[in-house]
Amino acid sequence: MNINEIMSLNVKTCEAQSSLDDVARLMWEHDCGAIPVVDDDNKPIGIVTDRDIAMAAMLKHKPLWSLTPEEFIYSQKLSCCEQNDSLQNCLDKMRSDGVRRIMVTNADGTLAGIVSIGDIVAFTGNSNMNSTSPSHSVNMGPVVEMLKEVSAHHSQLEKPMTAVKPN
């Protein structure tokens, strides 16, 4: 099974110079948690997640309209797979890169779609439940292992929660 059977199409994108305010609005309007950042040729150069926006706002102490993806995407590893890659290759790449979403590219490197762990879980669950042939079912073991790894918290970053008292 190839990843192009699972990937989301018609992905909303932004440019490196877009404001994080605009990126957050795209996420809200299209009910998604990540927006790929593309260059003028529609080739992925990074990705902005809802967590990136929250952390940028908190750490930079600036309004979102004054922040752009280019301020942090170049320090992140670009995680992509090709649309003809197998589900297993995509899972392996997500696991090795420690990501929950991976951009999918065409043979020419342009953005074709995106796949999230939620997409994979939904697809594998549906294919296993609806399959009449064992050859069409998906082995959930690698999916579950990948979910465990990318969902694990980084203990060195965890801090006890403290109550915030209003002024």
Q: What positions do the PLM features span?
A:
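Short hydrophobic beta-strand segments in globular cytosolic domains
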Residues: 44-45, 54, 105, 111-112, ...
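Tandem CBS (Bateman) regulatory domains
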Residues: 1-10, 49-99, 116-167
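Aromatic-residue detector
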Residues: 25, 34-35, 103, 110, ...
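Generic alpha-helical hydrophobic packing signal
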Residues: 13-14, 34, 69, 101, ...
